[in-house]
Swiss-Prot record:
Disulfide bonds: C74-C82, C86-C149, C193-C215
Glycosylated residues in this chain: N29, N141
One of the record's GO cellular component terms: plasma membrane
Keywords, sorted A to Z: Antiviral defense, Disulfide bond, Glycoprotein, Membrane, Receptor, Signal, Transmembrane, Transmembrane helix
Cytoplasmic side stretches: 251-567
Cellular compartment(s): Membrane
Molecular function via GO: cytokine receptor activity
Task performed by this protein: The IFNLR1/IL10RB dimer is a receptor for the cytokine ligands IFNL2 and IFNL3 and mediates their antiviral activity. The ligand/receptor complex stimulate the activation of the JAK/STAT signaling pathway leading to the expression of IFN-stimulated genes (ISG), which contribute to the antiviral state. Determines the cell type specificity of the lambda interferon action. Shows a more restricted pattern of expression in the epithelial tissues thereby limiting responses to lambda interferons primarily to epithelial cells of the respiratory, gastrointestinal, and reproductive tracts.
Transmembrane annotation, as ranges: 230-250
Fibronectin type-III domain span: 26-121
Membrane topology reported for the UniProt record: Single-pass type I membrane protein
Domain of life from the UniProt record: Eukaryota
Designated name of the protein: Interferon lambda receptor 1
Length: 567
Protein backbone atom coordinates (compact mmCIF):
# COMPACT_ATOMS: atom_id res chain seq x y z
CA UNK A 1 0.00 0.00 0.00
CA UNK A 2 1.51 3.50 -0.95
CA UNK A 3 2.41 5.98 1.71
CA UNK A 4 -0.08 8.57 0.69
CA UNK A 5 -2.95 6.22 1.10
CA UNK A 6 -1.89 5.46 4.70
CA UNK A 7 -1.74 9.13 5.51
CA UNK A 8 -5.30 9.70 4.17
CA UNK A 9 -6.81 6.98 6.26
CA UNK A 10 -5.10 8.20 9.41
CA UNK A 11 -6.37 11.71 8.81
CA UNK A 12 -9.92 10.53 8.37
CA UNK A 13 -9.80 8.47 11.53
CA UNK A 14 -8.45 11.34 13.49
CA UNK A 15 -11.17 13.64 12.25
CA UNK A 16 -13.97 11.12 12.92
CA UNK A 17 -13.01 10.14 16.45
CA UNK A 18 -13.59 13.46 18.21
CA UNK A 19 -16.92 14.03 16.45
CA UNK A 20 -18.55 10.73 17.71
CA UNK A 21 -17.56 11.05 21.34
CA UNK A 22 -18.86 14.49 21.45
CA UNK A 23 -22.43 13.49 20.48
CA UNK A 24 -23.45 10.68 23.03
CA UNK A 25 -21.98 10.82 26.50
CA UNK A 26 -22.04 7.50 28.51
CA UNK A 27 -24.68 6.74 31.22
CA UNK A 28 -23.77 7.64 34.77
CA UNK A 29 -24.30 6.03 38.23
CA UNK A 30 -24.79 2.53 36.88
CA UNK A 31 -25.88 0.41 39.91
CA UNK A 32 -27.16 -3.16 40.51
CA UNK A 33 -29.47 -3.19 43.51
CA UNK A 34 -32.27 -5.28 45.13
CA UNK A 35 -35.64 -3.88 46.13
CA UNK A 36 -38.88 -5.67 47.12
CA UNK A 37 -37.65 -9.14 46.18
CA UNK A 38 -36.28 -7.85 42.82
CA UNK A 39 -32.75 -7.33 41.41
CA UNK A 40 -32.65 -4.12 39.37
CA UNK A 41 -30.01 -2.32 37.33
CA UNK A 42 -30.33 1.46 37.45
CA UNK A 43 -28.44 4.42 35.88
CA UNK A 44 -28.78 8.05 34.97
CA UNK A 45 -28.38 9.66 31.49
CA UNK A 46 -25.03 11.22 30.62
CA UNK A 47 -24.58 14.94 30.49
CA UNK A 48 -25.65 16.47 27.14
CA UNK A 49 -27.56 13.34 26.07
CA UNK A 50 -30.30 14.03 23.52
CA UNK A 51 -33.91 13.45 24.62
CA UNK A 52 -34.41 10.55 22.23
CA UNK A 53 -31.51 8.54 23.57
CA UNK A 54 -32.04 4.76 24.01
CA UNK A 55 -30.38 2.30 26.38
CA UNK A 56 -29.31 -1.30 26.03
CA UNK A 57 -28.39 -3.69 28.92
CA UNK A 58 -26.50 -7.02 29.12
CA UNK A 59 -25.11 -9.15 31.98
CA UNK A 60 -22.51 -11.83 32.73
CA UNK A 61 -22.15 -14.33 35.58
CA UNK A 62 -19.02 -15.00 37.52
CA UNK A 63 -18.94 -18.59 36.34
CA UNK A 64 -18.78 -17.48 32.68
CA UNK A 65 -16.75 -14.34 32.58
CA UNK A 66 -16.38 -12.26 29.31
CA UNK A 67 -19.57 -13.72 27.93
CA UNK A 68 -22.16 -10.98 27.96
CA UNK A 69 -25.76 -11.91 27.51
CA UNK A 70 -28.23 -9.33 26.26
CA UNK A 71 -31.40 -8.80 28.26
CA UNK A 72 -34.34 -9.06 25.80
CA UNK A 73 -36.72 -6.75 27.65
CA UNK A 74 -33.96 -4.13 28.23
CA UNK A 75 -32.87 -3.44 24.63
CA UNK A 76 -33.31 0.13 23.22
CA UNK A 77 -35.43 1.27 26.15
CA UNK A 78 -36.07 4.81 27.26
CA UNK A 79 -36.20 3.99 30.99
CA UNK A 80 -33.15 4.30 33.19
CA UNK A 81 -33.64 0.92 34.98
CA UNK A 82 -33.85 -2.75 34.13
CA UNK A 83 -35.30 -5.58 36.28
CA UNK A 84 -32.95 -8.51 36.11
CA UNK A 85 -34.75 -10.72 38.69
CA UNK A 86 -36.07 -13.42 36.40
CA UNK A 87 -33.08 -13.15 34.00
CA UNK A 88 -30.59 -14.37 36.56
CA UNK A 89 -29.78 -18.01 35.76
CA UNK A 90 -28.89 -18.90 39.33
CA UNK A 91 -29.99 -17.08 42.51
CA UNK A 92 -26.95 -18.33 44.39
CA UNK A 93 -24.26 -17.09 41.89
CA UNK A 94 -22.89 -13.59 41.62
CA UNK A 95 -23.39 -11.63 38.42
CA UNK A 96 -22.98 -8.12 37.02
CA UNK A 97 -24.47 -5.98 34.17
CA UNK A 98 -23.50 -3.13 31.81
CA UNK A 99 -25.41 -0.45 29.83
CA UNK A 100 -24.83 1.98 26.89
CA UNK A 101 -26.73 4.85 25.28
CA UNK A 102 -27.65 5.01 21.56
CA UNK A 103 -28.98 7.82 19.41
CA UNK A 104 -29.27 7.28 15.63
CA UNK A 105 -25.85 6.55 14.27
CA UNK A 106 -24.17 7.54 17.53
CA UNK A 107 -23.76 5.48 20.71
CA UNK A 108 -21.95 5.73 24.00
CA UNK A 109 -19.42 3.32 25.56
CA UNK A 110 -20.56 0.42 27.93
CA UNK A 111 -20.68 1.18 31.60
CA UNK A 112 -20.40 -1.83 34.01
CA UNK A 113 -21.93 -2.45 37.51
CA UNK A 114 -20.63 -4.29 40.57
CA UNK A 115 -21.27 -8.00 41.29
CA UNK A 116 -24.35 -9.07 43.24
CA UNK A 117 -25.85 -12.37 44.53
CA UNK A 118 -29.63 -12.53 44.68
CA UNK A 119 -29.98 -14.88 47.67
CA UNK A 120 -27.61 -12.83 49.77
CA UNK A 121 -28.32 -9.32 48.56
CA UNK A 122 -32.05 -9.35 47.94
CA UNK A 123 -34.12 -6.84 49.86
CA UNK A 124 -37.47 -8.07 51.25
CA UNK A 125 -40.75 -6.20 51.19
CA UNK A 126 -43.43 -6.40 53.95
CA UNK A 127 -46.19 -8.91 53.18
CA UNK A 128 -49.86 -8.10 52.85
CA UNK A 129 -51.92 -9.60 55.74
CA UNK A 130 -55.27 -11.21 55.02
CA UNK A 131 -57.45 -11.49 58.18
CA UNK A 132 -60.65 -13.50 57.94
CA UNK A 133 -62.81 -12.92 61.04
CA UNK A 134 -65.34 -15.58 62.04
CA UNK A 135 -67.28 -16.38 65.21
CA UNK A 136 -64.75 -16.77 68.04
CA UNK A 137 -61.86 -17.35 65.58
CA UNK A 138 -59.84 -15.46 63.00
CA UNK A 139 -57.75 -16.85 60.13
CA UNK A 140 -54.54 -14.97 59.20
CA UNK A 141 -52.37 -15.51 56.11
CA UNK A 142 -49.88 -13.38 54.13
CA UNK A 143 -49.40 -12.38 50.51
CA UNK A 144 -45.89 -11.54 49.20
CA UNK A 145 -45.44 -8.98 46.39
CA UNK A 146 -42.79 -10.88 44.41
CA UNK A 147 -42.15 -12.24 40.97
CA UNK A 148 -43.34 -15.69 40.12
CA UNK A 149 -39.82 -16.83 39.32
CA UNK A 150 -38.64 -16.44 42.91
CA UNK A 151 -41.68 -17.97 44.71
CA UNK A 152 -39.86 -21.25 45.04
CA UNK A 153 -37.51 -19.78 47.60
CA UNK A 154 -38.34 -20.48 51.30
CA UNK A 155 -40.14 -17.27 52.13
CA UNK A 156 -41.61 -16.85 55.62
CA UNK A 157 -43.42 -14.18 57.56
CA UNK A 158 -43.95 -13.08 61.16
CA UNK A 159 -46.86 -11.07 62.55
CA UNK A 160 -47.88 -9.42 65.79
CA UNK A 161 -51.27 -9.21 67.53
CA UNK A 162 -52.01 -6.65 70.22
CA UNK A 163 -54.84 -4.61 71.65
CA UNK A 164 -54.94 -1.06 70.41
CA UNK A 165 -53.19 1.29 72.82
CA UNK A 166 -51.22 -1.49 74.46
CA UNK A 167 -47.51 -2.22 74.07
CA UNK A 168 -47.94 -5.89 74.86
CA UNK A 169 -47.79 -7.67 71.51
CA UNK A 170 -48.20 -11.34 70.88
CA UNK A 171 -45.78 -12.53 68.18
CA UNK A 172 -46.26 -15.33 65.68
CA UNK A 173 -42.89 -16.15 64.02
CA UNK A 174 -41.47 -18.14 61.10
CA UNK A 175 -44.72 -18.91 59.36
CA UNK A 176 -44.27 -20.18 55.84
CA UNK A 177 -45.68 -18.09 53.06
CA UNK A 178 -48.64 -20.28 52.12
CA UNK A 179 -49.59 -21.27 55.65
CA UNK A 180 -52.53 -19.64 57.48
CA UNK A 181 -52.80 -19.14 61.23
CA UNK A 182 -56.04 -19.66 63.23
CA UNK A 183 -56.46 -17.66 66.41
CA UNK A 184 -59.14 -18.24 69.06
CA UNK A 185 -60.71 -14.89 69.89
CA UNK A 186 -63.22 -16.06 72.53
CA UNK A 187 -61.34 -14.20 75.25
CA UNK A 188 -60.60 -11.19 73.06
CA UNK A 189 -62.86 -8.18 73.40
CA UNK A 190 -62.25 -4.83 71.81
CA UNK A 191 -60.05 -3.27 69.11
CA UNK A 192 -57.08 -5.41 68.10
CA UNK A 193 -54.33 -4.71 65.55
CA UNK A 194 -52.11 -6.85 63.28
CA UNK A 195 -48.84 -6.23 61.40
CA UNK A 196 -46.42 -8.58 59.62
CA UNK A 197 -42.99 -8.83 57.99
CA UNK A 198 -41.41 -11.25 55.53
CA UNK A 199 -38.23 -13.20 56.16
CA UNK A 200 -35.78 -15.57 54.50
CA UNK A 201 -32.90 -17.52 55.88
CA UNK A 202 -29.55 -17.16 54.12
CA UNK A 203 -26.47 -16.95 56.28
CA UNK A 204 -28.72 -15.44 58.87
CA UNK A 205 -32.40 -14.59 58.85
CA UNK A 206 -33.14 -11.58 56.72
CA UNK A 207 -36.31 -9.63 57.55
CA UNK A 208 -38.26 -6.91 55.92
CA UNK A 209 -39.83 -4.01 57.70
CA UNK A 210 -43.21 -4.49 59.43
CA UNK A 211 -46.25 -3.63 57.46
CA UNK A 212 -48.66 -0.94 58.48
CA UNK A 213 -50.99 -2.06 61.33
CA UNK A 214 -54.41 -3.38 60.44
CA UNK A 215 -56.95 -2.90 63.29
CA UNK A 216 -60.42 -4.37 63.76
CA UNK A 217 -63.07 -4.99 66.44
CA UNK A 218 -63.10 -8.52 67.81
CA UNK A 219 -66.32 -9.85 69.40
CA UNK A 220 -67.82 -6.40 69.22
CA UNK A 221 -71.41 -7.77 69.19
CA UNK A 222 -70.65 -10.37 71.85
CA UNK A 223 -70.18 -7.69 74.48
CA UNK A 224 -73.88 -6.87 74.30
CA UNK A 225 -75.21 -10.41 74.05
CA UNK A 226 -77.10 -11.81 77.02
CA UNK A 227 -75.37 -15.02 78.19
CA UNK A 228 -77.37 -18.11 77.35
CA UNK A 229 -76.56 -19.71 80.70
CA UNK A 230 -78.28 -16.82 82.46
CA UNK A 231 -81.54 -17.41 80.59
CA UNK A 232 -82.16 -20.78 82.32
CA UNK A 233 -82.68 -19.45 85.89
CA UNK A 234 -84.66 -16.51 84.53
CA UNK A 235 -86.95 -18.90 82.65
CA UNK A 236 -87.44 -21.08 85.75
CA UNK A 237 -88.20 -18.01 87.85
CA UNK A 238 -90.84 -16.88 85.37
CA UNK A 239 -92.50 -20.31 85.49
CA UNK A 240 -92.60 -20.28 89.31
CA UNK A 241 -94.05 -16.78 89.42
CA UNK A 242 -96.67 -17.67 86.83
CA UNK A 243 -97.67 -20.84 88.71
CA UNK A 244 -97.95 -18.97 92.00
CA UNK A 245 -100.10 -16.30 90.38
CA UNK A 246 -102.44 -18.89 88.86
CA UNK A 247 -102.82 -20.73 92.18
CA UNK A 248 -103.55 -17.47 93.99
CA UNK A 249 -106.17 -16.50 91.42
CA UNK A 250 -107.84 -19.91 91.67
CA UNK A 251 -108.02 -19.63 95.46
CA UNK A 252 -109.48 -16.14 95.25
CA UNK A 253 -112.05 -17.33 92.74
CA UNK A 254 -112.99 -20.31 94.93
CA UNK A 255 -113.68 -18.02 97.89
CA UNK A 256 -116.37 -16.15 95.96
CA UNK A 257 -118.13 -19.31 94.85
CA UNK A 258 -120.86 -20.71 97.05
CA UNK A 259 -121.62 -24.34 97.69
CA UNK A 260 -124.55 -25.61 95.60
CA UNK A 261 -127.72 -25.94 97.59
CA UNK A 262 -128.04 -29.60 96.66
CA UNK A 263 -124.69 -30.34 98.34
CA UNK A 264 -125.36 -28.30 101.49
CA UNK A 265 -126.35 -30.89 104.11
CA UNK A 266 -125.83 -28.70 107.16
CA UNK A 267 -129.58 -28.24 107.71
CA UNK A 268 -130.48 -31.91 107.29
CA UNK A 269 -131.48 -33.86 110.41
CA UNK A 270 -131.71 -37.62 110.68
CA UNK A 271 -135.03 -38.89 111.97
CA UNK A 272 -135.04 -41.28 114.89
CA UNK A 273 -132.88 -41.60 118.00
CA UNK A 274 -129.79 -39.46 118.40
CA UNK A 275 -126.41 -41.13 118.60
CA UNK A 276 -123.88 -39.47 120.85
CA UNK A 277 -120.28 -40.61 120.77
CA UNK A 278 -117.18 -39.00 122.19
CA UNK A 279 -114.29 -40.27 120.11
CA UNK A 280 -110.78 -40.62 121.33
CA UNK A 281 -107.52 -40.70 119.43
CA UNK A 282 -107.84 -44.42 118.66
CA UNK A 283 -111.47 -44.27 117.53
CA UNK A 284 -113.14 -43.32 114.28
CA UNK A 285 -116.54 -44.07 112.79
CA UNK A 286 -116.77 -46.36 109.79
CA UNK A 287 -120.18 -48.04 109.94
CA UNK A 288 -123.82 -47.01 109.72
CA UNK A 289 -126.77 -48.85 111.20
CA UNK A 290 -130.38 -48.65 110.01
CA UNK A 291 -133.22 -50.28 111.92
CA UNK A 292 -136.30 -51.54 110.16
CA UNK A 293 -139.60 -52.72 111.56
CA UNK A 294 -140.32 -55.06 108.66
CA UNK A 295 -138.59 -58.30 107.76
CA UNK A 296 -136.74 -58.07 104.46
CA UNK A 297 -137.24 -60.42 101.57
CA UNK A 298 -134.54 -62.78 100.42
CA UNK A 299 -133.86 -60.80 97.22
CA UNK A 300 -133.32 -57.45 98.94
CA UNK A 301 -131.27 -58.46 101.96
CA UNK A 302 -127.89 -58.30 100.23
CA UNK A 303 -128.62 -54.88 98.77
CA UNK A 304 -129.76 -53.55 102.14
CA UNK A 305 -126.69 -54.99 103.83
CA UNK A 306 -124.39 -53.17 101.42
CA UNK A 307 -126.30 -49.90 101.85
CA UNK A 308 -126.18 -50.12 105.64
CA UNK A 309 -122.46 -50.80 105.65
CA UNK A 310 -121.82 -47.79 103.43
CA UNK A 311 -123.93 -45.31 105.41
CA UNK A 312 -122.44 -45.46 108.92
CA UNK A 313 -119.50 -47.58 110.04
CA UNK A 314 -117.74 -47.53 113.38
CA UNK A 315 -114.27 -48.95 113.74
CA UNK A 316 -112.44 -49.28 117.01
CA UNK A 317 -108.75 -50.04 117.10
CA UNK A 318 -107.99 -52.61 119.82
CA UNK A 319 -104.73 -52.51 121.73
CA UNK A 320 -103.13 -55.42 123.55
CA UNK A 321 -102.05 -55.02 127.16
CA UNK A 322 -100.96 -58.52 128.11
CA UNK A 323 -99.53 -61.71 126.66
CA UNK A 324 -102.86 -63.49 127.21
CA UNK A 325 -104.64 -61.00 124.96
CA UNK A 326 -102.01 -61.49 122.23
CA UNK A 327 -102.51 -65.26 122.37
CA UNK A 328 -106.27 -64.83 122.06
CA UNK A 329 -105.75 -62.63 119.01
CA UNK A 330 -103.70 -65.32 117.29
CA UNK A 331 -106.20 -68.02 118.27
CA UNK A 332 -109.27 -66.14 117.08
CA UNK A 333 -107.84 -64.73 113.87
CA UNK A 334 -110.76 -65.42 111.53
CA UNK A 335 -113.33 -62.79 110.68
CA UNK A 336 -117.08 -62.84 111.25
CA UNK A 337 -119.28 -64.15 108.48
CA UNK A 338 -122.86 -63.14 109.19
CA UNK A 339 -125.86 -65.23 108.23
CA UNK A 340 -127.88 -63.43 105.63
CA UNK A 341 -130.77 -65.83 105.12
CA UNK A 342 -133.94 -64.64 106.79
CA UNK A 343 -137.30 -66.17 107.65
CA UNK A 344 -140.55 -64.48 107.02
CA UNK A 345 -141.99 -63.50 110.38
CA UNK A 346 -145.60 -62.52 111.02
CA UNK A 347 -146.29 -58.86 111.55
CA UNK A 348 -148.88 -59.48 114.26
CA UNK A 349 -148.56 -59.75 118.05
CA UNK A 350 -145.54 -57.42 118.16
CA UNK A 351 -145.29 -53.84 119.20
CA UNK A 352 -142.67 -51.68 120.79
CA UNK A 353 -143.18 -49.62 123.91
CA UNK A 354 -140.92 -48.36 126.66
CA UNK A 355 -142.33 -48.61 130.16
CA UNK A 356 -139.99 -47.55 132.94
CA UNK A 357 -138.46 -49.59 135.77
CA UNK A 358 -136.46 -48.68 138.78
CA UNK A 359 -133.17 -50.27 137.82
CA UNK A 360 -130.84 -47.27 137.85
CA UNK A 361 -127.92 -49.07 136.30
CA UNK A 362 -129.73 -49.79 133.05
CA UNK A 363 -131.61 -46.50 132.76
CA UNK A 364 -130.89 -43.74 130.33
CA UNK A 365 -130.95 -40.36 132.10
CA UNK A 366 -131.19 -42.06 135.53
CA UNK A 367 -134.42 -43.86 134.49
CA UNK A 368 -134.98 -47.45 133.37
CA UNK A 369 -136.48 -48.61 130.16
CA UNK A 370 -137.72 -51.95 128.93
CA UNK A 371 -138.72 -53.40 125.67
CA UNK A 372 -142.23 -54.76 125.58
CA UNK A 373 -144.11 -56.54 122.88
CA UNK A 374 -147.80 -55.94 122.35
CA UNK A 375 -149.93 -57.99 119.99
CA UNK A 376 -151.08 -56.57 116.74
CA UNK A 377 -147.89 -54.93 115.46
CA UNK A 378 -144.27 -55.66 114.67
CA UNK A 379 -141.54 -55.14 117.21
CA UNK A 380 -139.67 -51.90 116.44
CA UNK A 381 -135.99 -52.28 117.28
CA UNK A 382 -134.88 -49.16 115.43
CA UNK A 383 -134.48 -47.30 118.71
CA UNK A 384 -131.72 -49.74 119.65
CA UNK A 385 -129.98 -49.52 116.29
CA UNK A 386 -130.92 -53.01 114.97
CA UNK A 387 -131.60 -53.57 111.32
CA UNK A 388 -131.19 -57.28 110.51
CA UNK A 389 -133.04 -60.30 111.77
CA UNK A 390 -131.77 -63.83 112.26
CA UNK A 391 -132.72 -66.92 110.38
CA UNK A 392 -134.82 -69.43 112.04
CA UNK A 393 -134.79 -72.88 110.60
CA UNK A 394 -135.26 -76.43 111.75
CA UNK A 395 -132.09 -78.38 112.40
CA UNK A 396 -131.26 -81.82 113.70
CA UNK A 397 -129.46 -81.72 116.98
CA UNK A 398 -126.73 -84.14 118.01
CA UNK A 399 -129.27 -86.55 119.47
CA UNK A 400 -131.33 -86.65 116.26
CA UNK A 401 -134.30 -84.74 117.67
CA UNK A 402 -135.90 -81.96 115.69
CA UNK A 403 -137.63 -80.16 118.49
CA UNK A 404 -135.20 -77.35 118.96
CA UNK A 405 -134.92 -74.48 116.60
CA UNK A 406 -131.67 -72.63 116.21
CA UNK A 407 -130.88 -69.17 114.90
CA UNK A 408 -127.59 -67.34 114.73
CA UNK A 409 -126.70 -63.94 113.33
CA UNK A 410 -124.04 -61.29 113.55
CA UNK A 411 -123.67 -57.82 112.08
CA UNK A 412 -121.72 -54.57 112.50
CA UNK A 413 -123.35 -51.54 114.04
CA UNK A 414 -122.25 -48.00 114.80
CA UNK A 415 -121.39 -49.08 118.36
CA UNK A 416 -119.24 -52.04 117.39
CA UNK A 417 -120.09 -55.68 116.83
CA UNK A 418 -122.57 -57.83 118.81
CA UNK A 419 -122.70 -61.55 118.17
CA UNK A 420 -125.21 -64.13 119.29
CA UNK A 421 -123.34 -67.29 118.50
CA UNK A 422 -125.69 -69.89 119.97
CA UNK A 423 -129.45 -69.44 120.20
CA UNK A 424 -131.92 -72.25 120.61
CA UNK A 425 -135.62 -71.67 120.46
CA UNK A 426 -137.60 -73.99 122.71
CA UNK A 427 -139.62 -76.60 120.98
CA UNK A 428 -143.19 -77.59 121.76
CA UNK A 429 -142.05 -80.04 124.41
CA UNK A 430 -139.90 -77.54 126.14
CA UNK A 431 -142.67 -75.03 126.05
CA UNK A 432 -144.90 -77.26 128.00
CA UNK A 433 -142.32 -77.79 130.67
CA UNK A 434 -141.73 -74.13 131.28
CA UNK A 435 -145.14 -72.75 130.59
CA UNK A 436 -145.45 -71.37 134.07
CA UNK A 437 -142.44 -69.12 133.68
CA UNK A 438 -143.48 -65.62 132.88
CA UNK A 439 -140.11 -64.14 132.02
CA UNK A 440 -138.07 -65.06 128.98
CA UNK A 441 -134.50 -63.99 128.41
CA UNK A 442 -132.32 -63.98 125.30
CA UNK A 443 -128.70 -64.76 125.95
CA UNK A 444 -126.03 -62.76 124.10
CA UNK A 445 -122.32 -63.27 124.59
CA UNK A 446 -120.29 -60.15 123.76
CA UNK A 447 -116.92 -60.69 122.15
CA UNK A 448 -115.76 -57.13 122.72
CA UNK A 449 -116.75 -54.23 124.92
CA UNK A 450 -118.20 -50.94 123.89
CA UNK A 451 -116.23 -47.75 123.59
CA UNK A 452 -116.17 -45.47 126.57
CA UNK A 453 -118.75 -42.70 126.32
CA UNK A 454 -120.45 -44.27 123.27
CA UNK A 455 -124.15 -44.89 123.45
CA UNK A 456 -127.42 -44.48 121.63
CA UNK A 457 -129.44 -41.53 122.75
CA UNK A 458 -133.12 -42.47 122.77
CA UNK A 459 -136.27 -40.58 123.59
CA UNK A 460 -137.44 -40.47 127.17
CA UNK A 461 -139.82 -43.36 126.73
CA UNK A 462 -137.32 -45.68 125.07
CA UNK A 463 -134.75 -48.01 126.58
CA UNK A 464 -130.98 -47.51 126.13
CA UNK A 465 -128.62 -50.38 125.47
CA UNK A 466 -126.19 -50.50 128.37
CA UNK A 467 -123.03 -52.26 129.38
CA UNK A 468 -121.97 -53.93 132.55
CA UNK A 469 -118.80 -55.95 133.05
CA UNK A 470 -118.20 -55.98 129.29
CA UNK A 471 -121.53 -57.74 128.49
CA UNK A 472 -124.81 -56.48 127.12
CA UNK A 473 -128.16 -57.65 128.41
CA UNK A 474 -131.24 -57.07 126.28
CA UNK A 475 -134.35 -58.30 128.08
CA UNK A 476 -137.89 -58.18 126.95
CA UNK A 477 -141.21 -59.38 128.35
CA UNK A 478 -143.22 -61.63 126.10
CA UNK A 479 -146.99 -62.08 126.62
CA UNK A 480 -148.69 -65.42 126.54
CA UNK A 481 -151.58 -64.02 124.56
CA UNK A 482 -151.89 -60.27 124.31
CA UNK A 483 -150.13 -59.36 127.52
CA UNK A 484 -146.73 -57.62 127.11
CA UNK A 485 -143.57 -59.52 127.84
CA UNK A 486 -141.26 -57.89 130.39
CA UNK A 487 -137.63 -57.60 129.48
CA UNK A 488 -135.38 -58.75 132.29
CA UNK A 489 -132.24 -60.76 133.09
CA UNK A 490 -134.07 -63.91 134.28
CA UNK A 491 -132.54 -67.11 132.95
CA UNK A 492 -135.83 -68.58 131.78
CA UNK A 493 -137.82 -67.88 128.66
CA UNK A 494 -141.47 -68.88 128.16
CA UNK A 495 -142.46 -69.00 124.57
CA UNK A 496 -145.77 -69.53 122.90
CA UNK A 497 -145.32 -72.27 120.29
CA UNK A 498 -148.17 -70.86 118.23
CA UNK A 499 -146.26 -67.65 117.67
CA UNK A 500 -143.44 -67.18 115.28
CA UNK A 501 -140.85 -64.74 116.60
CA UNK A 502 -137.80 -62.99 115.34
CA UNK A 503 -134.64 -62.34 117.24
CA UNK A 504 -132.15 -59.79 116.03
CA UNK A 505 -128.60 -60.94 116.47
CA UNK A 506 -125.78 -58.49 116.07
CA UNK A 507 -122.06 -58.46 116.72
CA UNK A 508 -120.48 -55.55 118.57
CA UNK A 509 -116.74 -55.03 118.28
CA UNK A 510 -115.05 -52.11 120.02
CA UNK A 511 -111.66 -51.09 121.30
CA UNK A 512 -110.53 -53.34 124.08
CA UNK A 513 -109.18 -50.50 126.21
CA UNK A 514 -112.47 -48.56 126.37
CA UNK A 515 -115.52 -48.82 128.62
CA UNK A 516 -119.12 -47.76 128.04
CA UNK A 517 -121.37 -45.52 130.14
CA UNK A 518 -124.96 -46.49 130.63
CA UNK A 519 -126.11 -42.92 130.98
CA UNK A 520 -125.36 -40.55 128.09
CA UNK A 521 -126.80 -37.44 129.73
CA UNK A 522 -125.47 -37.86 133.22
CA UNK A 523 -121.88 -37.26 132.10
CA UNK A 524 -120.61 -39.98 134.48
CA UNK A 525 -118.73 -42.55 132.51
CA UNK A 526 -117.53 -45.76 134.04
CA UNK A 527 -114.26 -47.16 132.92
CA UNK A 528 -114.08 -50.92 132.77
CA UNK A 529 -111.29 -53.34 132.28
CA UNK A 530 -112.17 -54.94 128.99
CA UNK A 531 -111.29 -58.43 127.96
CA UNK A 532 -108.66 -59.12 125.36
CA UNK A 533 -109.53 -58.36 121.75
CA UNK A 534 -110.63 -61.53 120.01
CA UNK A 535 -112.01 -62.52 116.68
CA UNK A 536 -114.17 -65.49 115.98
CA UNK A 537 -112.35 -68.47 114.58
CA UNK A 538 -113.83 -71.14 112.46
CA UNK A 539 -115.19 -72.87 115.59
CA UNK A 540 -116.07 -71.17 118.87
CA UNK A 541 -115.90 -73.43 121.85
CA UNK A 542 -118.61 -73.11 124.50
CA UNK A 543 -116.13 -73.56 127.33
CA UNK A 544 -114.05 -70.63 126.12
CA UNK A 545 -117.10 -68.42 125.83
CA UNK A 546 -118.21 -69.26 129.36
CA UNK A 547 -114.80 -68.50 130.78
CA UNK A 548 -114.58 -65.11 129.15
CA UNK A 549 -118.02 -63.73 129.72
CA UNK A 550 -120.30 -64.01 132.72
CA UNK A 551 -123.44 -62.09 131.94
CA UNK A 552 -125.51 -63.35 129.06
CA UNK A 553 -128.95 -62.97 127.58
CA UNK A 554 -130.74 -66.11 128.48
CA UNK A 555 -134.01 -67.53 127.42
CA UNK A 556 -135.87 -70.66 128.31
CA UNK A 557 -134.57 -73.77 126.64
CA UNK A 558 -131.19 -72.24 125.80
CA UNK A 559 -128.48 -74.66 124.73
CA UNK A 560 -124.99 -74.14 123.35
CA UNK A 561 -124.07 -75.22 119.87
CA UNK A 562 -120.95 -74.68 117.80
CA UNK A 563 -120.77 -71.85 115.34
CA UNK A 564 -119.67 -73.11 111.94
CA UNK A 565 -118.30 -70.60 109.51
CA UNK A 566 -120.00 -70.49 106.17
CA UNK A 567 -117.56 -71.18 103.31
Amino acid sequence: MSAWRIRVLATLCFLWQPRVHGQLPPPQNVTLLSKDFDMILTWTPGEGSPPDVLYTVRYESKTRMDKWIKVPHCRNIHSVSCNLTCVIPNFFIKFRAQVKATSGRFHSPWVKSQFKEYHLDVELAPPLLNVNVKENVIHVNATFPMAICVESLPWMYDFNLWEAGSEDKKQYKSIFRKKAVTIDTTALRGNYCFNARSSIQSIDFKHSKFSQPVCMQLNYEGEWKFPFSATIPVFVLLILLTSASIIWLLKQDAKHKKMPQTLDLSNCKIAGPTFCCELRENEFLTDCLICTDKPMSQGKKNKTLAQNNQMWMASFLPSSSSEEEEEEEEEDSSSFIPYTEMLQFPRKHFNFQTPRTADAETILDSTSGVLSVVGGSTLDLSALGFSFFPIRKNEMDTSGSQGNEKASHSHSSSLGRISLTDVRFPGPREHGQHGTDSNDCLEVSLLHTLMNSSCTRLPADEHCLYKKDHDFTICYQKPTLDQPVQVSENPLLNEDPSMEKFIYLQTLQVAEDEGFASDCDSGNFTEGTPPASTVLSDELRISDMEKRYDKKFKFKGYQHSHYMRRS
